């Protein structure tokens, strides 16, 4: 799992 990518996705949603 790419946490950096996941974090960016979550940030975009928030």
Curated annotation (Swiss-Prot):
Residue numbers bearing the Leucine amide modification: 14
Segments crossing the lipid bilayer: none
GO CC annotation: extracellular region; membrane; other organism cell membrane
Localization in the cell: Secreted; Target cell membrane
Main localization of the protein described in the UniProt heading: secreted
Tissue expression: Expressed by the venom gland.
InterPro entries tied to this protein: Mastoparan_peptide
Pfam families documented for this protein: Mastoparan_2 (PF08251)
Molecular-function annotations in GO: toxin activity
Alphabetized UniProt keyword annotations: Amidation, G-protein coupled receptor impairing toxin, Mast cell degranulation, Membrane, Secreted, Target cell membrane, Target membrane, Toxin
Function: Mast cell degranulating peptide. Has hemolytic activity. Its mast cell degranulation activity may be related to the activation of G-protein coupled receptors in mast cells as well as interaction with other proteins located in cell endosomal membranes in the mast cells.
Sequence similarity: Belongs to the MCD family. Mastoparan subfamily.
Protein name as annotated: Protopolybia-mastoparan-I
